[in-house]
């Protein structure tokens, strides 16, 4: 089992969620986050004054994924979140040792 963290542009969330549902990944945690990579933010004009926006709004999803689905899951996220522009995001894949369902204590 693996844990996928993906960070991408917020307007792509529905597209990513629907694409993952189609391949059988139906549960995920979604968090609104801010960050920057190579693009280092941008400059905006507000009431006549320029200021630098260092952190850009992003969405982060976290989903448990069976080992056999990891390649298709990362490809699915990549295709659904892709715009071709700077700041499209990143996908991180990590080993997942154990999951415990709080309600029942079930592990797996």
Please provide the spans of the model-predicted regions:
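Positively charged, small/polar-rich N-terminal and surface patches that mediate targeting and assembly
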Residues: 1-108
